[in-house]
Amino acid sequence: VDTVQSALDSAEPGQTLTLDAAIEEPEVTASQLKAVLFRDVLGETRTHVSGSAGRIGNVKRSAKTISGVVLNSGETFSYNQTVGQRTEARGYKPAPAYVKGETVDEVGGGICQTSSTLYLACLLSNLEITERYAHRYVPAYISPGMDATVSWGGPDYKFTNNTLYPIKIVTSYSGGYLTVKILGTKTDSTYVKMTNEKLSTTNYEVVYEDDDTLAPGTEQVKTTPYTGS
């Protein structure tokens, strides 16, 4: 480059120059790279979606938002940043959600099923999990220990593409089931199988509280109890 620039600088106006040039071929061409991009399913998970219409809609909406996201090698995915704040203005509906140990209606309730399904797909893809938090209770839609709770302004779910090639998140919803796939390029024969083992259980404790709004002798369950494990 310096030689060419020097010749141009010293040339007379209108002078024709003959310059030596060497063509360097890339180690990998665009066509070669395109042929291997997203050719393999690194990991795939399917969970059954149930509940109110609002909850199902929230799961479908959040899944649609993350579908098609591409991460280059070394890039990190944030569920909260990608999905964004869950508001009614953005199409999310009130639905049951776990809040401080209680089940209450919250805008965006149910989106943890999307993050949990994604989390398990990432585990099966052998991706690097950089941030993940479990629910206080074991959700019914996924195996124990395979969930990932999220909350706007609170817990997030993050993972990093630790492969040599770009990866893509692909989601679909059909027949009451949410499917999450991680597409990428396999470079070895590594195979991931997830298992869990129950080490202990913790029985719940029944706590009674006075409530003047109820008729004498009436009982009302405030929070559905679960056995911890």
Predicted regions and their residues:
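Well-ordered beta-sheet/strand-loop patches within structured domains
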Residues: 1-229
